[in-house]
Amino acid sequence: LDLLIEASIRAMEGTRHAQLAHWFSILPKVGLSEEQLGAGRLAAWASAAAATGTVVEVNEKWGCPGPVAVLALRDAGARIVASTDSHDAADVGRYDRVTAVLDAVEAAEREERR
């Protein structure tokens, strides 16, 4: 996981105008989850995204990054956009999974304010 985050940061630092698409979608494919990244890794990743002006997509098809990673991005001041990653015209502009991720982020923020 450290290598994944380090490689992600280096890629952002080495690319002008980067945009990360369905970042962390590899994790469940190899038996891991975003939760295993931990707050420190996510904070470093999110800070790098903010510092480099990297745009991070919340991806409809893969449902990632998830709420914890999106919270880290928001806390760092990174730019976040929605993406359908659609391969079918009928799916363009439909954001059921993205909405669920953002709703979870909003709920977590409400809890933090209490």
Identify the function of each model-found stretch.
Residues 1-51, 103-107:
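Extended substrate/RNA-proximal surfaces in nucleic-acid metabolism proteins
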Residues 18-19, 53-57, 79-81:
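Structural preference for beta-strand elements that scaffold enzyme active sites
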Residues 38, 74-76, 97-102:
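Short, hinge-like loop/turn segments at secondary-structure boundaries
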Residues 44-45, 68-73, 97:
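A short acidic, amphipathic alpha-helical/loop segment
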Residues 64-68, 72, 89-92:
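Short active-site-adjacent structural elements
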Residues 93-114:
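Mid-to-C-terminal alpha-helical segments outside catalytic/metal-binding sites
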Residues 79-93:
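Short acidic/histidine-rich active-site segments
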Residues 23, 60-61, 84-86:
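Active-site metal-binding loops of divalent metal-dependent hydrolases
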